[in-house]
């Protein structure tokens, strides 16, 4: 009896363990697994686990486009086999084609007739009419003449090709998906190549494509004739025809100042440079070519003017670089703002600011002691440095370590906040302002595309950023930075120890503590303050806020 009770007790324990093991609603914090109820009920599982982290799989990497000229024919295209070929007057009718025939007048008939194996269609009261081998353009005249043999008058005829014969064509060789593909006799070679996935851009040839019927070669196709000249012969396919894409032939690469920067294929052992340039289409202003050629373990470069291209040849594996080798003779700058002179000036290369200031005609509102200079190259460099700072900030926020689960959750929320801030900051475009020194402003060298702005005289001081009411305040002698901030309602509660900078009218940025007196046209910027346990994050955000305020005159908040 005791033995029986022991067996029952052991069985009950195993049953309890099994029940606990299959409890799909068990606490995931204890089991380490997410609850499965939603999944078993056909619901989608949440992409975020209980800790709040996003488990969404990363997006697939972008598809790398091939550099081979011709690969664009098969990028994202799908074959559309149109059965009607009435638009092609040279189409030759074959058994299996469908022809629409309409007769009206003394005798009426309207129907679709199929060409039988003997090449005939049968017209009521007329009899068989042989149409196989007749071009589509002659079809209506042929049927009309046969009807007129029976009905001399009062019967009108209209005949047109309705549908071509369905066929199956083999596509093989160096294509992505070789096989047997269906279509109609009027489908072009491109249709069948697209159905087979296109020419393999790494191994296949765009200039060596053969169409065979049995053992007889019907045509040799070079797709470059279509891409460059719009020529693609129309051929009618029959059941069992084979399209063979050969292996890649010789190639050369074109880079530089050209419209078609691709790798090109050619059939012969060499190709004239002039023909290669006609394919690549150099941009206006291109002056020179560089031919880079590998010879064994050595690499040789040749540099010529484009005018000397005739007579020179490219070989397999060569690289042709087209460049513009010109020296700037003049530069163009724009003069904007408060002046009465010309707004565009063409100056000799190497001109200085003095050459512009001598031609500027200031008016009564011109603030000539605060001339501003904006340069595209400086704006590009500012953008590069801003992106670098943003990248470091993201790395610092994502690499922060946590010792507890609560701290990890806070770090995750902070990282999401910083990611949104970084996304906003990436959209900011720096102005590229160059701070001019009054002592040597005349000797500043100018670049092509520079913009010189003559600011207007003003009696206002602008206050931006973390103040209750950002506004413009009338300038008053003796007022300090704190006075202007108080005029705008004072600092916000979260900016008690905020960093304040003053931007002069000429673009110079000065710490507010170092400003003795404010001038008309100054801008006071109160930067937001951000605190984090991660010192690198705090330093990174503070640096970026300062860069945005000085480089783009923009204040972003988190």
UniProtKB/Swiss-Prot annotation:
User: Which molecular function GO terms apply here?
Assistant: polysaccharide transmembrane transporter activity
- What residue stretch is flagged as signal peptide? 1-20
Q: Could you list this entry's UniProt keywords, alphabetically sorted.
A: Capsule biogenesis/degradation, Periplasm, Signal, Transport
Q: Describe the task this protein carries out.
A: Involved in the translocation of the polysialic acid capsule across the outer membrane to the cell surface. May function as the periplasmic binding element of the PSA transport system, in which it transiently interacts with the membrane component of the transporter, binds polysaccharide and transports the polymer to a component in the outer membrane.
Q: Tell me the protein family, please.
A: To E.coli K5 KpsD.
What is this protein's record name?
Polysialic acid transport protein KpsD
* Localization, UniProt: Periplasm
Please give the start and end residues of each transmembrane region: none
Which Gene3D superfamilies does the annotation name? Outer membrane lipoprotein wza domain like, wza like domain
Give the source species. Answer: Escherichia coli
**GO cellular component terms attached to this protein's record:** periplasmic space
Give the gene name. kpsD
Chief place where the protein resides: periplasm
Please give the superkingdom of this protein's source. Answer: Bacteria
The record's listing under InterPro entries reads: Poly_export, Poly_export_N, Soluble_ligand-bd
């Amino acid at each position: 009896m005791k033995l029986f009770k022991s067996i029952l007790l052991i069985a009950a324990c195993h049953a309890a363990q099994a029940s606990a093991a299959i409890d799909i609603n068990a606490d995931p914090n204890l089991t380490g697994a997410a609850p499965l109820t939603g999944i078993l009920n056909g619901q989608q599982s949440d992409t975020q686990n209980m800790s709040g982290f996003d488990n969404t799989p990363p997006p697939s990497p972008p598809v790398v486009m091939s550099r081979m000229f011709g690969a664009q024919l098969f990028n994202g295209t799908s074959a559309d086999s149109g059965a009607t070929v009435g638009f092609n007057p040279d189409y030759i009718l074959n058994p299996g084609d469908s022809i629409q025939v309409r007769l009206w007048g003394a005798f009426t008939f309207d129907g679709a007739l199929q060409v039988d194996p003997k090449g005939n269609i049968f017209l009521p009261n007329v009899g068989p009419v042989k149409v196989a081998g007749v071009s589509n353009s002659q079809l209506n005249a042929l049927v009309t003449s046969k009807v007129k043999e029976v009905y001399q008058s009062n019967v009108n005829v209209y005949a047109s090709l309705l549908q071509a014969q369905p066929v199956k064509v083999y596509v093989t060789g160096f294509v992505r998906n070789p096989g047997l593909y269906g279509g109609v006799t009027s489908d072009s070679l491109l249709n069948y190549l697209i159905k087979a996935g296109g020419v393999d851009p790494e191994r296949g040839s765009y200039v060596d494509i053969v169409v065979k019927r049995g053992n007889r070669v019907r045509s040799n196709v070079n797709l470059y004739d279509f891409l460059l000249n719009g020529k693609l012969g129309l051929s009618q396919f029959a059941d069992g025809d084979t399209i063979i894409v050969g292996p890649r032939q010789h190639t050369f690469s074109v880079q530089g100042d050209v419209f078609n920067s691709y790798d090109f294929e050619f059939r012969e052992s060499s190709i004239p440079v002039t023909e290669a340039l006609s394919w690549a289409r150099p941009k206006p202003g291109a002056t020179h070519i560089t031919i880079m050629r590998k010879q064994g373990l050595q690499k040789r470069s040749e540099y010529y003017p484009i005018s000397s291209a005739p007579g020179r040849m490219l070989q397999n594996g060569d690289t042709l670089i087209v460049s513009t080798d010109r020296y700037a003779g003049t530069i163009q700058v724009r003069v904007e703002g408060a002046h009465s002179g010309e707004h565009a000036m063409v100056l000799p290369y190497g001109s200085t600011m003095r050459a512009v200031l001598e031609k500027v005609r200031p008016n009564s509102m011109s603030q000539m002691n605060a001339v501003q200079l904006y340069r595209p190259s400086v704006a590009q460099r500012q953008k590069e440095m801003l992106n670098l700072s943003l990248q470091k900030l993201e790395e610092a926020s994502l690499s922060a370590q946590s010792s507890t689960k609560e701290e990890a959750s806070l770090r995750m929320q902070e990282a999401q906040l910083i990611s949104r801030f970084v996304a906003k900051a990436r959209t900011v475009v720096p102005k590229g302002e160059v701070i001019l020194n009054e002592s040597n402003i005349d000797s500043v060298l100018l670049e092509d595309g520079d913009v010189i702005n003559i600011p207007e005289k003003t009696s206002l001081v602008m206050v931006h950023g973390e103040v209750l009411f950002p506004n413009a305040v009338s300038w008053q002698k003796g007022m300090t930075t704190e006075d202007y901030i108080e005029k705008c309602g004072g600092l916000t509660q979260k900016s008690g120890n905020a960093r304040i900078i003053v931007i002069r009218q000429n673009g110079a940025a000065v710490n507010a503590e170092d400003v003795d007196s404010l001038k008309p046209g100054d801008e006071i910027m109160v930067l937001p303050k951000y605190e984090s346990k991660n010192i690198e994050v705090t330093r990174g955000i503070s640096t970026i806020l300062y860069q945005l305020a000085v480089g783009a005159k923009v204040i972003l908040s988190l």
